[in-house]
């Protein structure tokens, strides 16, 4: 007999981040679109944004990485390539600062999402806050008394760390890319306070 886990909480009452859910979302995108997640990203995000230095890494396309960078642990040991590196949806997009800024500008210009979709992405979908933060659709949400809502996301995997922080009220963006996984994450509000 199948074991059915107990429900952790009712829908729309809490948020618990799960990389596995993003992997599931990538599979849903493939099933609905009829193309691979890699091709979907290329056609619907990278090409419209002219992101020429971005690619979704899979185990089958190591040669497509443009100017590949090695990731390191906190003691400067090179991270090894493991089988989970080919999982998609929760990680695996290789990009650079210029392409990240093109992606950001496309969000401001409406190239990727309609205004109503952006509102949903940047809207709190429950009352739960963790360390003063909430979660929208694919964006964590921090708050600043002067600059307002701060949509952002962090990422890390096997020696790499990323910060993508938006300040829509000022049309400002912070992108931090690192190839060493060392030390604590930056506080998003501290990063935002570096901006004028």
What are these regions (language model features)?
Residues 1-158:
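Short, surface-exposed loop or secondary-structure junction motifs
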Residues 21, 138, 173, 187-192:
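Glycine-centered structural positions embedded in regular secondary structure
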Residues 131, 149, 174-176, 184-186:
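Short acidic, gly/pro-rich beta-turn/loop elements at beta-sheet edges
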Residues 144-146, 181-196:
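Short, gly/Ser/Thr-rich active-site loops of penicillin-recognizing serine hydrolases
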Residues 157-158, 179-181:
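Short, glycine-/Ser/Thr-/acidic-enriched flexible segments
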Residues 160-161, 184:
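Short active-site-adjacent structural elements
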Residues 163-166, 170-180:
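Short, well-ordered beta-strand elements
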């Amino acid at each position: 007999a199948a074991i059915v886990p107990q429900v952790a909480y009712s829908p729309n009452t809490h948020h618990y981040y799960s990389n596995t859910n993003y992997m599931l979302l990538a599979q849903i995108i493939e099933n609905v679109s009829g193309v691979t997640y890699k091709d979907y990203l290329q056609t619907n995000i990278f090409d419209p944004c002219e992101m020429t230095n971005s690619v979704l890494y899979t185990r089958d396309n190591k040669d497509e990485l443009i100017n590949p960078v090695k990731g390191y642990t906190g003691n400067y040991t090179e991270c090894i390539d493991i089988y989970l590196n080919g999982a998609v949806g929760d990680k695996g997009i290789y990009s650079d600062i210029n392409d990240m800024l093109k992606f950001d500008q496309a969000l401001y210009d409406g190239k990727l999402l309609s205004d109503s979709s952006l509102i949903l992405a940047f809207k709190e979908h429950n009352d739960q806050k963790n360390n003063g933060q909430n979660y929208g659709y694919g964006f964590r949400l921090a708050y600043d008394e002067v600059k307002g809502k701060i949509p952002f996301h962090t990422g890390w995997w096997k020696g790499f760390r990323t910060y993508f922080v938006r300040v829509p009220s000022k049309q400002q963006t912070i992108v931090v890319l690192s190839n060493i996984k060392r030390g604590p994450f930056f506080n998003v509000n501290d990063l935002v306070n570096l901006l004028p």
